[in-house]
Amino acid sequence: MASTTVAQLAAELSRSAAALLEQLQAAGVGKATPEDIITESDKTRLLDYLKRSHGQADDSARKKITLTKRETSEIRQSDATGKTRTVQVEVRKKRVLIKRDDAAPEHQADGAEAQAHVVDAAEEARREEEERRQAEQLARQEAEAKAAREAAEREEAERRARQEALEAEQRRQAELAARKAEEEAAASRAVTEANEDTSRKKAEDEKARVAAERAEAQKAADEAKAAADKARAEQEIAARKRREAAEAEARAIQQMLNAPARVLKAPSERKAEEKKAEQTGTLHKPVKPAGTEAKPGEKKPVTATATTTTDKKGKVVKAGTSSTWQDEGSRKKGSGLKTRGDSSGGVGGWRGGPRGRGGRQQQHDDSRSNFQAPTEPVVREVHVPETISVADLAHKMAVKASEVIKQMMKLGQMVTINQVLDQETAMIVVEEMGHKAYAAKLDDPEALLVVDGEEHEDAELLPRPPVVTVMGHVDHGKTSLLDYIRRTKVAAGEAGGITQHIGAYHVETDRGVITFLDTPGHEAFTAMRARGAKATDIVILVVAADDGVMPQTKEAIAHAKAAGVPIVVAINKVDKPEANPDRVKQELVAEQVVPEEYGGDSPFVPVSAKTGAGIEDLLEQVSLQAEVLELKAPVDAPAKGLVVEAQLDKGKGPIATILVSSGTLKRGDVVLAGSAYGRVRAMLDENGKATKEAGPSIPVEIQGLSEVPAAGEEVLVLPDERKAREIALFRQGKFRDVKLAKQQAAKLENMLEQMTEGEVQTLPLIVKADVQGSQEALVQSLQKLSTAEVRVQIVHGGVGGISESDVNLATASKAVIIGFNVRADAGARKLAEHNGIDIRYYNIIYDAVDEIKAAMSGMLAPEKRETTTGTVEVRQVFRVPKVGAVAGCMVTDGVVKRNSLVRVLRNNVVIHDGELDSLKRFKDDVKEVKQGFECGLSIKNFNDVQEGDQLEVYEITEVARTL
């Protein structure tokens, strides 16, 4: 028996010798080196130790080893629907091995051997039975595979046979057609030749009948040719029909042959396909057969394709698609996916039937034809507003927004779904997509106002008082004249004795009620006077007899003529010694205002607001003009009017002075004035007394509006507050874009001006006034002060007192706050004092304009002026080391000061312009040298001084500029 070393045993066990030595020592076998001899007893001890350490203490247990072998293959088969499936075939082989223990005691050997024989016999029988079953299964699988291969080979052979038969039939038909054509051509040639021979013989034999025979021969030839052509045409039609039938059969065969072959796929590809199938669809539709195509006689839709082909994978591919994008929707509906809009009753539709029908219903649906009748494209009439988003345009055309975006891309414009298109672009897109585009009118809720106004046109018209506007130049006595009429002293209460608001009053005279509007005469209130002329029936033009026609008088005449109202001229201040009414008449005639005594239509009335002379005549002329005009207005109707003035009161809120033009305004009515609306909470007359209603030509002051309306806005009474709010919000949004566009344009213009003209001084201002008319006039007057060097910037303009928000805005913009007839509250004053904000209060408009003009003058760059102070003649030149040229001079005129500017003249030509460096008399430095004295001087950075040169000494002074 060969001896075994520790190293050899370690090599057999595929272990390292060191690890085996450790295990031997742990088992109690004394081996120290790999060269030591190991015996069978040592191996047994090692085995026992290993069994104990691994948890197997019972040696009597027999070991049983089971071997399982698996073989996997794939077979591709087609089911009844034509879909190809992959079938996995797995073959399992199982084998059990039992290891006997030869080291058992001898007295157990016989029993163990007998038991082993019994076990081996049973195991052998079981293994034989299992091998037999596996052999049968393998044989059955091989038979199935062989049958599948034979079926495929048979199909291939049949396909080849059909293809060859088809080709042979085509060749035979072509040869037959060619042969028939040749035979017919030969027959026709033979007939023609025979006819020619006959005619030639007859021409030689019988010359008399040549013409007749030739005609008959020609007729026979024509008939033969027509018959031949007819036969040829019939043959061509038959050949074309046969060719089309053969091509259709060939396409069907080609489509069948292009079905996927039954090949084995790798498991990874099969898993990927299964995963893709789980992700993409739930229903399957078979490929549409060629026979279901539309017939030539049927009407095809515009977007239908011409041909249908299949790719290598058997999927339907459109060849020759139309140029429109609308094919995608039909292709999506034709796919096997569930789509919410598919209500055609097709197989793939979500409305195809109830869910509980089972597999039979699905199989029946799969066998149903997929052909859908073509439909005509729907042409819609799309009304396109001024602006419309892409999503809204798609909704109007009943298409997806992506279709509109694609069409815009085709037109060369990249848009998003929320991008706004202008009307012209949107109409082009609509027409490109096959619909009809119409320019729609803006959905204007103000159209409701016209309808409401028409409902009350049939109201009874009653006489109304005239509205008389008093206009004229400043300080010509308009308000004083009105005071005498009203028997009040309004003029004494105006700041500076000038009118700065529109005052509306109604006066009861002996000749009826007259409503007066007193307008300011200062040049800044142009817009106010224009509004006064717009609301009036008659204009009283007040001209001072001692002053004559002035600029604002001419402007008032222009406003009155623009409004188309008659003018009554009141020549005021006739009680003054220097009054000259005739000169006033001549000046007014030059302005196209001709008095009645000169043949005109304007009555001239000399009056005196101080003594009251001529007032009655003036009122009589006004009444006569009113009678001529026949002023009437409905009384029992919703009120309409005009905003004469508006302001913001700290306690009452927005307040508007309204002149009612028609209807009756009552407390509690819902009014709309521009973008402001609200319910009339309180109504006061011009004396501050509460009133419940106001009829035509009556001025009132109302409270309860949502904001301060713009002066000159039309006032309407609406039936409910909801409609008023809707129209007001519409008006606010309608002009917001225009306002922003103007602001942006102004910013751009300012930026360009600053870039081109350099840095411009800016005076930022915040203007707050008591009424809107004054604020408007003040802002316009201040903006007129802007020049190319200093510009007035109105940061904010508003109505009402100066608040803390105004001070904060002034702090941020470094602006000066101007308060016109308003004051700052305590919080605003404290905040302004803390932040160093300048707040200026004014009561007279030209005081504010003058002070701002003075401030702007201070911001102007000072003007530099040059003044010659003396003249020096160079008598001698000295060269001093380290100093340069020193000129000995005589002051011939004026005085020379140290550090003065100097010009060097040689032959009356300036050769240098610089500054004196030093000035001495003898050896002493002096500050100045007067005329007639000698001095020595040196010029900074100039040494080319020569005898006979003239030095001109001058200085530059800065002079403040004014606007």
Swiss-Prot record:
Residue numbers spanned by region G2: 497-501
GO terms under cellular component: cytosol
InterPro entries attached to this UniProt entry: DNA-bd_dom_put_sf (IPR009061), EF-G-like_DII (IPR053905), EFTu-like_2 (IPR004161), IF2_assoc_dom_bac (IPR013575), IF2_II (IPR044145), IF2_N (IPR006847), P-loop_NTPase (IPR027417), Small_GTP-bd (IPR005225)
Domain of life, source organism: Bacteria
Residues the entry annotates as binding GTP: 472-479, 518-522, 572-575
Polar residues composition bias: residue spans: 78-87
Biased composition (Basic and acidic residues): 53-77, 98-110, 123-183, 197-250, 267-278
Region (Disordered): 53-377
GO MF: GTP binding; GTPase activity; guanosine tetraphosphate binding; translation initiation factor activity
Coiled coil: none
Compartments where located: Cytoplasm
UniProtKB keywords: Cytoplasm, GTP-binding, Initiation factor, Nucleotide-binding, Protein biosynthesis
Keyword Transmembrane: no
Domain tr-type G: start-end pairs: 463-632
UniProt-annotated stretches for the region G4: 572-575
G5, as annotated region: 608-610
Ranges annotated as biased composition (Gly residues): 343-356
Region (G1): 472-479
Spans annotated as G3: 518-521
Function comment: One of the essential components for the initiation of protein synthesis. Protects formylmethionyl-tRNA from spontaneous hydrolysis and promotes its binding to the 30S ribosomal subunits. Also involved in the hydrolysis of GTP during the formation of the 70S ribosomal complex.
Listed HAMAP family: IF_2_B (MF_00100_B)
Protein name as it appears in the record: Translation initiation factor IF-2
Species whose genome carries this gene: Cupriavidus taiwanensis (strain DSM 17343 / BCRC 17206 / CCUG 44338 / CIP 107171 / LMG 19424 / R1) (Ralstonia taiwanensis (strain LMG 19424))
Lineage, broadest ranks: Bacteria, Pseudomonadati, Pseudomonadota, Betaproteobacteria, Burkholderiales
Gene that this sequence comes from: infB
